[in-house]
Amino acid sequence: MDPMTWKLLGLALYLAVLLGIGVAASRKMEDVAEYFAASKSLGFWSVAFSARATGESAWLLLGLTGMGAAVGIRGFWVVLGEMLGVMGAWHLMAKRFNRLTRRYDSLTIPDYLEARFRDDSHALRLVSAGALVVFVTIYVSAQIDATGSAFESFLGIDWFVGVAIGFGVVMAYSVTGGFKAVVWSDVFQGSLMLLGLVLLPAVGLWAIGGIRPLQANLFVIEPHLLSATGGKGWTPEVIAGTLGLLLIGLGFMGSPQIFARFLALRDEREIRNGALVAFLWTLLADSGAVLTGMLGRVLLDRPGQPMIGTDDVVGALGKGGQDVLPLLVDHLMPAALVGLYIAIVLSAIMSTVDSLLVLASSAAVRDVYQKVLNPDVRDDQLVGLSRIATLVLGLLALGLALLVAFFVPGRTIFWFVIFGWSGIAATFCPAMILSLYWPRYTRNGALASMITGFLCVPLFKFVVPGLPGVGPVFGALEELTPAFLLAMAVGAAVSLMGEPPPVDEELREAAE
């Protein structure tokens, strides 16, 4: 068979498996608890792979590999930061959260927050739902954009056709199968991602002769690729940038798309094994991504030509190095395996899109319609409404992706991937951490944390970096870290200014 036939065969097989998962999961659909939380029946293997596949997105396959090509070993600060965040979420938060959500009978993160703070006004629920719909739409639109780019890069298919194919498949299994289909597909897709990010650098190291030749070649190309500071020393901007990379893992410590998996665990005893699986997955996949970029910088080097593209410069490895993985796959792998890597890149994208769409639909249907507008609605009606909401939110994200493609043709997807991720994390993570560990934390404090995080992400993205003096430091730090810390500080201050909440026996028992 010719190379294109192999590529299309691998893609068709991958898409067929996803559609089969959606059909199988839809046959088990009985009620809204099944649609949104898989009836809290998942084991550690499913939850660990699903949480990691969901938490990474296209950024792992295209963004982190590009970072490895652009900055070399400095990219390992991200690996360390993500490992710390993953372990913090599993070891410090998962058990308490799982215990409390069972005692509160929560199906969603807003369910948990409202029960934890006894918020009869539904303010926490409404703020949570609004933030999820806004930032999930942004995040998913970036992933849809990446789907079109993947089809374009690997197969030469028009961007719009690629978007239509990817969008149609992910909507089909997400709408029909709900959360269980999402988790099953995440296990499949997370396995593909891990396989691909271990196999490609292994083949690359074999081709180049090992680690020492890699180091020697990188030093000849650009010595700063072997420097943890990028060759600039520990200046304030470098320190801030390094902190920003290290603290990227904060986003795992409370983000609803991750914690929805902890909520669905069948038993808290699954957490220890799940933590180990998640840690190893992160170590291997993230390290493989950075190594892939570094190997691409050597194996695809073109002397005299810019390698890393910018807004003003066309680079051989694409803007920010984000084309290094597809180019290296074409360089090293036989045609039959190129088809596998198309599936792997799409796995990174779709495993995030499906999870976020079901999460946002739960916010709209469970947290607003059922809990606030129509408490008497039947479960069988909710499942149908949830499917409609998933479809509508997906169409909104598709519309945003098409608008961005039309008005900003020279875009890179990754700034608004990080923007959407940071928005979700800064809104929820401070409130989740304090709600699990600080009995003095109040309902008004939680509201203040969430609103502050929600507003500070665009502030630190678009306004603060342009300020004289401190602007470059905050620009290097990225928006998540300052927004996260400010949201936590404001929530603590508002809580201390108010009346102490009643003693929460369930919170005390969950900490034991």
Predicted regions and their residues:
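Membrane-embedded helix-loop-helix hairpins and adjacent transmembrane boundary segments
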Residues: 1-512
